[in-house]
From Swiss-Prot:
The keyword Phosphoprotein does not apply. Its EC number is 6.3.4.19. Keywords: ATP-binding, Cytoplasm, Ligase, Nucleotide-binding, tRNA processing. The keyword tRNA processing applies. It catalyses: cytidine(34) in tRNA(Ile2) + L-lysine + ATP = lysidine(34) in tRNA(Ile2) + AMP + diphosphate + H(+). Its main location: cytoplasm. The lineage of its organism: Bacteria, Pseudomonadati, Pseudomonadota, Alphaproteobacteria, Rickettsiales. The N-terminal region contains the highly conserved SGGXDS motif, predicted to be a P-loop motif involved in ATP binding. It is found in: Cytoplasm. Belongs to the tRNA(Ile)-lysidine synthase family. The gene is tilS. It comes from Rickettsia akari (strain Hartford). InterPro entries: Rossmann-like_a/b/a_fold, TilS/TtcA_N, tRNA_Ile_lys_synt, tRNA_Ile_lys_synt_N. Pfam families: ATP_bind_3. This is tRNA(Ile)-lysidine synthase. ATP binds at residues 27-32.
Length: 430
């Protein structure tokens, strides 16, 4: 029975989490509609509040009908439904990737707003097989070819309880229960490589899919038993991350690890230092690895970071001037700025703006800044790093740069910590 398989999966994935709330992402397609009905049964049995989230990407005429249909199903099940909208701003470059990131941003932000810790998605067995083929075409390594049934995004746990259930079983379940769903016409378009792979797999013999699943399991096992522990050791031994939001990599210690792990370390640092959520592609990281082997000092930019070799160390800090962080008003007690720093005010102040240091502001306060400590820690790269730090302004005046203990008056009311909003499935343990 499908439900029994689903129940076994979700109980194993969630464990003893003690949840009272959970959310499910539903588009209106067969996979997510089946997930909604299965999750509803499970939530009723376990007395858990289930919320339903739909995201309209505003790319197809049918999408609004799909959202309306999901809303009707949710109402019939007495479940709260939230309809979100992705604004593509008429920018169609790299649209699939941007739409995916936008979708997860919207859904996880909603989860955070309502204290929901877990989001269910409808990735099923066929999706895993297709992903494996796509990544194999891109020459992905062990980490890229591996799969996970639990991921993290924006500090929300993303769980995939259909991971070992083929699409055919989900469709059969819906048909047997007389449940309708929508077909996304883009799934039949040759415009997308995934669709071409799906068609080839459908025409192939059943043993091909079985062999891919077996290879996936072997890779996952290799990752869990060899490469994940090596990655954790490498980060502990070779990486130093500083409160100023930059990092040093010890290249002597770094050299002893496998190439697979080296790529992941560089990507790990690029993500947390840049404040981005997505990893750089291997072809972008590879030139840096080659430069490291040449044993010469260099300075490059990659993934929103400056990567600079200084003797036997690699310095990585945020690139200033490219995609500058947004200014934010500190209305609550604390706020995350640039996806990297948590700023907390210890007492009531007039509305403060958290932003970056402009050249004009720097010239005004330059003589009052004590950068000695930052200079020592960063091997004299203090001026560049200074412009990546959060500053606090009131009425366009810089009143504080907490990292370097600069305050315009005696009231030291702010605390700043480096708290990048990123969790890796390779370094996080539930």
């Amino acid at each position: 029975m499908l439900y029994e398989k689903f129940e076994y999966n979700i109980n194993n994935l969630i464990g003893n989490f003690g949840l009272s709330k959970i959310a499910v992402a539903v588009s209106g397609g067969s996979d997510s509609v089946a997930l909604l009905y299965l999750a509803n049964i499970w939530a009723e049995k376990n007395n858990i509040e289930l919320s339903v989230i739909s995201v309209d990407h505003n790319l197809r005429e049918q999408s609004k009908q799909e959202t309306y249909y999901v809303q009707n199903i949710s109402n019939s099940l007495n479940r709260k439904h939230y309809s979100l909208s992705f604004d593509h701003q008429n920018n169609f470059s790299n649209l699939q990737e941007r739409a995916r990131a936008g979708r997860y941003d919207l859904m996880t932000n909603l989860c955070l707003e309502f204290d929901i810790l877990v989001l269910l998605t409808a990735h099923h067995e066929d999706d895993y097989v297709e992903n494996f083929c796509l990544r194999l075409e891109r020459n992905s390594g062990i980490f890229g070819l591996s799969s996970s049934n639990i991921n993290w995004y924006n500090n929300i746990q993303i769980i995939r309880p259909l991971y070992n259930i083929p699409k055919s079983e989900l469709v059969e379940y819906l048909v047997s229960h007389n449940i309708k769903w929508f077909e996304d016409e883009s799934n039949s378009s040759d415009k997308y490589r995934r669709n071409i792979i799906r068609q080839k797999l459908a025409k192939g013999a059943g043993y091909i899919k079985a062999e891919i699943i077996l290879q996936q399991l072997k890779i996952n096992d290799l990752l869990d038993n060899k490469f994940k522990p090596e990655l954790i050791s490498a980060i502990a031994e070779a990486v130093k991350i500083f409160e100023y939001g930059f990092a040093f990599l010890d290249l002597v210690k770094f050299d002893k690890f496998s190439n697979e792990v080296k790529v992941q370390i560089i990507n790990f640092l690029l993500i947390i230092i840049s404040g981005q959520f997505r990893a750089a592609r291997f072809y972008s990281v590879e030139p840096i690895l080659k430069l490291i082997t040449q044993d010469v000092n260099f300075k490059n930019t990659l993934h929103g970071c400056v990567v600079k070799r200084i003797q036997n160390e690699l310095l990585i800090y945020r690139e200033f001037g490219k995609k500058l962080p947004e200014s934010k008003i500190l209305l609550d007690k604390s706020i995350i700025w640039d996806n990297r720093f948590c700023i907390t005010k210890n007492q009531e102040n007039p509305d403060c703006v958290i932003t970056y240091l402009s050249l004009e502001d720097y010239k005004t306060i330059k003589k009052q800044l004590d950068l000695a400590h930052l200079k020592d820690l960063s091997c004299k790269n203090h001026n560049a790093i200074l412009f990546t730090l959060p500053i606090i302004k009131i009425l366009e005046k810089v009143i504080a740069i907490p990292h370097i203990s600069y305050y315009d008056n005696d009231m030291q009311n702010f605390e700043v910590s480096f708290a990048p909003n990123f969790v890796s499935r390779f370094t996080h343990f539930c």
